[in-house]
Regions:
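Membrane helix-loop-helix hairpins that form the core translocation module of multi-pass transporters
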Residues: 27-123, 187
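Membrane-interacting alpha-helical segments
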Residues: 7, 11, 22, 52, ...
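Interfacial segments of multi-pass membrane proteins
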Residues: 19-38, 157-180
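Functional transmembrane core segments of multi-pass inner-membrane proteins
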Residues: 122-149, 153-159, 163-164, 168-175
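Alpha-helical transmembrane segments of multi-pass membrane proteins, especially transporters
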Residues: 8, 74-79, 105, 141, ...
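Cytoplasmic-side transmembrane-helix entry/capping segments in multi-pass membrane proteins
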Residues: 66-73, 130-138, 178-182
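Divalent metal-coordination and catalytic microenvironments
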Residues: 16, 58, 112, 152, ...
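Short, small-residue-biased leader/transition segments that mark boundaries at the very start
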Residues: 3-5
Length: 188
């Protein structure tokens, strides 16, 4: 499990699926046998690092009620699709129990990699700040985040791509991706 922790620490904020890594480690090294506590520990580290890195912006959000209400709204709409998919569909369980999980994970890695390669073309034309995001855009980014429930789809990568595709500047897309990651990762 130490190898998984090191891998997660190195790749967590790269647009690479950490759940995909866990699937691969589990299949290649079945003796590692990660349990729920190990995975929860990895999530806690992720949460702390997001909050610490963005602490100034997060405190700024909490310092103004109008700003707080706006961010609360776009966070709720940004996580709602993942909550619905995670709670009410058996897709995740079917994928996790599939004998073809390594193939699914590989296809997901490839698909997301291709999209990320072309993302820079999109990013150069983006002009929207996070304060200009609409509820519909937040929900669309949330739909993208729901796809990250599949191993091999990076949550940060797919939400970053969706936000940039919808016009957010890259820095704001990254911040929003991390912001909606806090409750999503906490819920996982």
């Amino acid at each position: 499990s130490e190898m998984c922790i090191r891998d997660r620490g190195i790749t967590e904020f790269l647009p690479i699926s950490s759940s995909g890594h866990l699937v691969i480690f589990d299949k290649l090294f079945p003796a590692i046998n990660l349990n729920t506590n190990d995975i929860a520990f990895l999530h806690i580290g992720t949460l702390f690092s997001i909050v610490i890195f963005y602490r100034a912006r997060i405190l700024q959000i909490f310092s103004n009620l109008i700003i707080f209400k706006f961010y609360l709204k776009i966070i709720i709409f940004g996580i709602l699709p993942a909550v619905i998919v995670g709670l009410f569909t058996p897709i995740q369980e079917a994928i996790d129990n599939s004998s073809q999980i390594l193939i699914y994970t590989g296809i997901a890695y490839f698909f997301l990699s291709v999209l990320l390669i072309f993302s820079e073309r999109i990013a150069s034309k983006n002009i929207l700040s996070i304060e200009e995001i609409t509820i519909n855009q937040a929900f669309m980014i949330g739909i993208a985040q729901a796809f990250a429930l599949m191993p091999g789809i990076s949550r940060s990568g797919v939400t970053l791509l969706a936000a940039m595709y919808l016009g957010l500047k890259k820095a704001d897309a990254i911040f929003y991706s991390m912001l909606i990651g806090i409750p999503t990762i906490f819920g996982a």
